[in-house]
Amino acid sequence: MKTVSEQMELARKAQAIVNDYTQEQIDEICLAIGWEVYEDENIAKLAKMAVEETGYGNVQSKIIKHKRKVGGVLHDIKGAKSVGLIERNEETGISKYAKPVGVVCAILPATNPTATCGGKAVGILKGRNAVIFKPSSRALKSTTEAINMMRAGLRKVGAPEDLIQVLEDPSREAITELMKVSDLIVATGSGQVVRAAYSSGTPAYGVGQGNACAIVAEDADVAEAAKMICGSKLFDYATSCSSENAVIPVEAVYDQFMAEMKKNGCYLVTGEDREKLKNHMWKPNAKGKIALNPDIIAKSAQVIADGAGISIEGTDILLVEGMEPILGDKFHDEKISPVLTVYKAKDFKDAYRILVELTNLVGRGHSCGIHTYKHEYIEFLGEHMKSSRITVRQSMSAGNGGHPFNRMPSTATLGCGTWGGNSTTENVHWRHFINVTWVNEPVAPWTFTDEDMWGDFWKKYGK
């Protein structure tokens, strides 16, 4: 087993080699490693390994996720400049040159180990960097297999395979050391992991907690909205932090919406069964704090219902009606499972109130969605919601992280801004893995008169 310092030395030697690569050579590297975690046989193997090892999600969804995430990053970087001169503006005299950030420490989640690993590697290497991945201990085998596949891709094009490594020492001391000696950290995982990254002393990108919530307005295509929400919630048994946790249909379409949800395989849990479900989903953890039961995370509705002692048949998603006060009902929380809370709102104004309260309690800064064609609703949310991304008439688990039907940058790392304790609101993607040098040349100077600057101000307030 290599030490962190030994792995870092290998990474720096590999990065030094590609530091002088051309754009064409770097793009070949990205295609080589991308293919290894996109090719059908390989990703079927990785998906099966990930489900067997972690117990999270399902194989078919993880195969699709590989295609979406890796394919999405490859689409985003195709033709993009990341070596040398990337931009020149003759009018301003500004030229921009891309430089590597160096060696990146990338911390991976157990819920989405191999697709996140593949997409991240492509984006990081696009900037002529090296990466050392720290997998979840629960997903070590599947993540290592994905990394070995990509190392084979590097060998195929004659590139140094140590551009991509997995941290060999699983100890807490090793990951702490790796974070300190890396040039940049990208942390996709729990709040504890992200806080450790931010406190390491190394520049870091992290994610905030999810609790994606969507409004269904009175003008929505209700059948289509229900279909999208169910598809999003069921996908990989809701491993994605962008999977809808709550939906807020307005009263005018509530009954129709619930009927459509039933058509899409949902079952409304009520009465004593609702209480049983709550008590099964949230239990005291090792510290005695009520927390999400690990046994329900990314499991099927049937497995969750069986554990709760609820009788259901042919059900894909469990629904519960939300109660107010919202804080007093645990179902407002992030669930990471095919369990969805439904809140009935009087109208859009009331739906907005519920949305704000939900996301202020959990998932501040992450995301929200709306199913509507009314631009005034969309613009109102854009103006007022403290969300880093607002997804309109789309599946949130697909749309938030980039998809062919929108132009969001493809990623599995969603920044939540200062609202969520992060350094950016952006989808963390390949452009976050380059340093940019700004070269400025002299141009005609700008000037202004006092009247130009303060004229209107003086008219209103005087000198």
Question: What does each of the following model-derived ranges do?
Answer:
Residues 1-95, 123, 263:
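N-terminal Rossmann-like NAD(P)+-binding subdomain of aldehyde/semialdehyde dehydrogenases
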Residues 7-9, 206-208, 237-241, 329-336, ...:
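Short, flexible turn/loop "capping" segments at secondary-structure junctions
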Residues 12-22, 30-41, 50, 54-58, ...:
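Structural signal for hydrophobic packing residues in well-ordered secondary-structure cores
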Residues 15, 19, 310-463:
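Conserved C-terminal structural/oligomerization subdomain of aldehyde/semialdehyde dehydrogenase
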Residues 20-25, 45-47, 160-163, 237-241, ...:
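Flexible, glycine/charged-enriched surface loops at secondary-structure junctions
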Residues 82-224:
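Rossmann-like NAD(P) dinucleotide-binding subdomain of oxidoreductase/dehydrogenase enzymes
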Residues 118, 194-326:
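ALDH superfamily catalytic-core signature
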Residues 132-137, 248, 393-394:
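Short internal beta-strands
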